Regions:
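Domain-core and long-helix interface of multi-subunit machines
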Residues: 53, 148-250, 266
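An N-terminally biased module of ancient metal coordination in phosphate/nucleic-acid-related enzymes
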Residues: 3, 10-129, 133, 139, ...
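Well-ordered, non-membrane alpha-helical segments in soluble/globular domains
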Residues: 99-106, 173-177, 272
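Mid-to-C-terminal alpha-helical segments outside catalytic/metal-binding sites
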Residues: 12, 18-31, 269-298
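Active-site core of metal-dependent hydrolases
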Residues: 224-233, 257, 261-262, 272, ...
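Short, hinge-like loop/turn segments at secondary-structure boundaries
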Residues: 92-94, 165-166, 243-245, 272-275
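Non-catalytic positions within long, well-ordered alpha-helices that form the structural scaffold/packing
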Residues: 67, 140, 184-185, 248, ...
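Short acidic/polar active-site loop segments enriched in Thr and Asp
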Residues: 72-73, 145, 190, 285
Length: 298
């Protein structure tokens, strides 16, 4: 049986959550709660839900964990549905018919926990120019606060060129950057998630040239770049320290994103400490609350 969290939290209580992973479900026992004194990570706009098929935990559990961890603002940004042609089916994003339930759930939690935390409704999505206008039309039905760009594929997803695979083609990094910049030009995206996702095995010169172009654009247009803490805690090829050296030269705005797929990661203080060490070492301009942009054309 899953213990249901109380609707209001008594901040006088002390103790901790206990987490158990059983039969592909995340069980949370809300017993006594120990609120963390957290001054290094007060916002997180990169949070997923089970609707994307690779996250665990109930929406409420993410909110409870965020409050416990000391967050002041929690943004939900699950993987957006997309409108592909033909019979192509994307397995890592919510279905369009799940969106009303997602919206209703987040808005209900926003109202319920308004005295404890600020909750924002968003999506993480790619820029696929062939289908993007149809996606914006779909978004217009809902009170979405923001979307973030996570460019998981180059070109369109049906071509299966996953950005995180190792690419040795010398033009691949620039192809990725060109598509990202074209997407950012729409003015729809609040920030760029894991900007260094493209796993480039070509020449250092071509990597730096493309990264420099992306960072120059981001700096000029005040688009924050995310240090992705999922990549950090899972020891992936990103975040890439060399990429953020280039971002520092352009004085880019930097935001920390937990990229939480489990409630326990919604306030990842250990990774945040490492990310802040990067910011201090490189002189990066870290921001906590970006300007939220509604997903519509300029």
């Amino acid at each position: 049986m899953i213990a249901q969290p109380a609707k209001t939290i008594d901040r006088k209580l002390t103790g901790e959550y206990s987490w158990e992973w059983t039969k592909n479900e995340l069980y949370m026992k809300t017993e006594e709660i120990n609120f963390v004194e957290n001054k290094i990570l007060t916002t997180n706009f990169h949070t997923h839900t089970t609707r994307c098929n690779h996250a665990v935990g109930e929406d409420r559990q993410y909110v409870e964990a965020a409050i416990k961890g000391g967050l002041k603002v929690l943004g939900f940004s699950d993987h957006s549905p997309y409108f592909f042609s033909g019979d192509y089916y994307s397995t890592f994003r919510m279905k369009r018919e799940q969106v009303p339930g997602y919206v209703d759930s987040i808005l209900a939690l926003k109202k319920e926990y308004k005295d404890d935390i600020e909750i924002k409704l968003g999506f993480e999505t790619e820029y696929y120019p062939k289908y993007f206008d149809k996606l914006l039309e779909f978004y217009s039905q809902y009170p979405i606060d923001y979307i973030i760009m996570g460019q998981h594929f180059v070109l369109n997803e049906e071509e299966h060129i996953y950005s995180g695979d190792l690419h040795h083609e010398e033009d691949m990094m620039m192809r990725y950057v060109d598509q990202v910049i074209e997407g950012l030009e729409t003015g729809c995206f609040t920030y760029l998630a894991h900007p260094d996702l493209l796993n480039f095995g070509g020449s250092k010169e071509n990597y730096e040239k493309a990264a420099d172009e992306l960072c120059a654009y981001a700096a000029k247009n005040k688009v924050p770049l995310e240090i992705n803490m999922l990549g950090m805690r899972e020891h992936r090829h990103y975040p890439n320290f060399e990429f953020f050296k280039i971002a520092a030269r352009h004085n880019c705005d930097i935001i920390l994103g937990c990229d939480a797929h489990e409630p326990k990661d919604v306030c990842d203080l250990e990774s945040a400490k490492t990310a802040l060490e990067w910011c201090r070492e490189l002189g990066l301009n870290r921001i906590e609350y970006p300007e939220l942009k509604k997903p519509c054309r300029k």
